[in-house]
């Protein structure tokens, strides 16, 4: 695969970007505008550095695309002597990005601000917003959650997903999924990759214990992906799992990894292994349970005298948010 050198591309000095992990510049490549993300500068706390953030962004977005979800386009290349990821700017054609945080801030009846990631409050905001038909937005949210579960995304906060607002009509559409640099264990360098591959306890810890979702329960505790997806009765979540599961093509996913330039062989082996493990130990287990619950639901409704419990329309995380006092 030919590699791309962005060094001599025309820079757009009039656009800047937020975010904490690494520098970003705007430039033109093939007459299209891209945001180019650089790897973060070395940290004194190596275990907290995002060593492979550019690889994570590139590979994760291509995997999300393979699932049939709308996602930003990414290219991997170099800028001077650094490996960078270029993310195609989807706001260039008269669209403005409005993040979910901004929307949630308008829910003045909620006790906490738009930044807070309590799942109940997020679902409440989805149900009560007027940007997008709530059922459509809810489907998108749970599809993204299932994808983030497979990819181990620990930072899908309210500021890195949202909407595109047309500047002329003020109409809204759901923005492509973006900012996937916190997927696929970006803090794992080659030494950590080798350590995990040679120790089943280290591997399982990264499946069952962490990374966790940044979404929180009502006890302000981060949601564990395995526990949530294998225990929830949230019909919208289970429907998303049943919808996304048939699209997970591990051969395609492994091909994406194999064809990623610049990546070390041990890093590729690590990603192959971790994605196989996350699928078999989380997604497959949750999917089997989702099928069983779906069958129970159908059987219960086929018999008018059967009082079997129905699947919740929202689950234990029913939108009953804490109100402002």
From Swiss-Prot:
Domains as described in the record: The C-terminal tail (residues 301-325) is not required for the kinase activity and for translocation into human cells.
Binding positions for ATP per the UniProt entry: 21-24, 37, 72, 88-90, 179
One Gene Ontology MF term: ATP binding
PTM description: Autophosphorylates on either Thr-3 or Thr-7.
Protein name: Serine/threonine-protein kinase CtkA
Result when mutating residue 179 to Q: Loss of kinase activity
Lipid metabolism recorded as keyword: no
The keyword Nucleotide-binding belongs to this UniProt entry's keyword annotation: yes
Induction line: Is strongly expressed in response to the interaction of H.pylori with the mammalian gastric mucosa.
GO CC terms in record: extracellular region; host cell cytosol; host cell nucleus
Alphabetical list of InterPro entries matching this protein: HipA-like_C (IPR012893)
Its EC number(s): 2.7.11.1
Gene Ontology terms: biological process: positive regulation of cytokine production; positive regulation of NF-kappaB transcription factor activity; positive regulation of non-canonical NF-kappaB signal transduction; positive regulation of peptidyl-serine phosphorylation; symbiont-mediated activation of host NF-kappaB cascade
Enzyme class: transferase
Keywords: ATP-binding, Host cytoplasm, Host nucleus, Kinase, Magnesium, Metal-binding, Nucleotide-binding, Phosphoprotein, Secreted, Serine/threonine-protein kinase, Transferase, Virulence
Subcellular location: Secreted; Host cytoplasm, Host cytosol; Host nucleus
Binding site for Mg(2+): 160, 179
Superkingdom, natural source: Bacteria
Reaction catalysis annotation: L-seryl-[protein] + ATP = O-phospho-L-seryl-[protein] + ADP + H(+); L-threonyl-[protein] + ATP = O-phospho-L-threonyl-[protein] + ADP + H(+)
Function recorded in the entry: Virulence factor acting as a pro-inflammatory protein that induces the secretion of the pro-inflammatory cytokines TNF-alpha (tumor necrosis factor-alpha) and IL-8 (interleukin-8) from human macrophages, as well as enhanced translocation of the transcription factor NF-kappa-B complex in macrophages. Is a kinase capable of autophosphorylating itself at a threonine residue near the N-terminus.
Annotated spans, Disordered: 296-325
